[in-house]
Amino acid sequence: MLAFNPLVTALAALIFLFCQANANPPLMQRLVHEYQWKTKQGLPRQGACTPHNLAVRREWSTLDVETRLEYIEAVKCLARLPSIIDPELAPGARSRFDDFQATHIRHTRTIHATGSFFAWHRHFVYLYEKALREECGYTGYQPYWEWSHWANLPITANPLYDGSNASLSGNGVYIPNRNGTLQLFPIPNPSPDTAIYTPPGTGGGYIYDGPLVDWELHLGPVLYSYDNGQYIPPNPRPDGLGYNPRPLIRDFNNTLLQQGASWDIILNMLVNVTDMHEFHPLFFQGPHLAGHIFISGVDNDIFTSPGDPLFWFHHAQVDRIWTIWQALDLETREYALDGTLTLLNCKNLPFRRILAGELTVCDDSTAQP
């Protein structure tokens, strides 16, 4: 079972240095260099963690094919290793990979749109990375996915999900004539009126190429999505933790990245958003959400999204952007939090209005005491 400190301190980010992808805008390059310099300046010259022995996370496209294949094999290894989570907590878990998804399912309502969102997922990615290295022999660190770099390029241009043997497999089979996906949000009394709508993308069915073509999900769904286009058998348990084997669905949609994670959006947040109470909701409903619904499939269920191995690249990038933002004013931002441990700190807030920018805080009538 995975153990968590409820609020992992922001200082934990300093053991990692994120190496940027090629061809980023000059402003982004300057911000990354400033973050890297400040990180190294803040470390002791001697000891267990120095500027000379930092762990470095890299963008997938900058890795050589040998390293990519090593990573893919480690992911498959986690999916082969038996689960160690308490079966009373997650009876459907069959593998070590499932253990991470089960943990995310169990904590979802306290780790999204809450004060613990960034720090909890930082530690979560670290534990997954640690399992890849210590249990499955991976010698690198968790790569990230630079959304903005790929948003305006053809989907197959990204070696992370181009369907090649050195990718994390590609898109799902294209299903035409769909109305999109409606995901109920986990607030009290959810309904289609308080749901997240995802327009149909370029897939919608099961993945059909690449090394994860036989990938099998065992947990979920928790939030059943309407008009998905591909039938998803319901889980035998209402909490989604029962055994429910099925293939992996994807529905890539670059338009969502262009609208939610473009360079303009990312750079505006890094340069102009200086307060955590503004940065958190803007980032959560913008780049964070855009990456998930670009992938779609299991990522259209906020509980079960770690069931797709692309989740870990997405959240490594989430952590990277937060890390850069922190480093630009570390004295103020290192321990800055926004929110409580109650999702949205609301009893029943229409989430669509938040996505549309109409609401960023709860009304007094909906706030938790």
From Swiss-Prot:
GO molecular-function terms, A-Z: metal ion binding; monooxygenase activity
Keyword Secreted attributed: no
Glycosylation sites: 165, 179, 253, 272
Protein biosynthesis keyword on record: no
List of residues binding Cu cation B: 315
Disulfide bonds: none
Protein name: Tyrosinase-like protein orsC
Organism encoding this protein: Emericella nidulans (strain FGSC A4 / ATCC 38163 / CBS 112.46 / NRRL 194 / M139)
Phylogenetic lineage: Eukaryota, Fungi, Dikarya, Ascomycota, Pezizomycotina
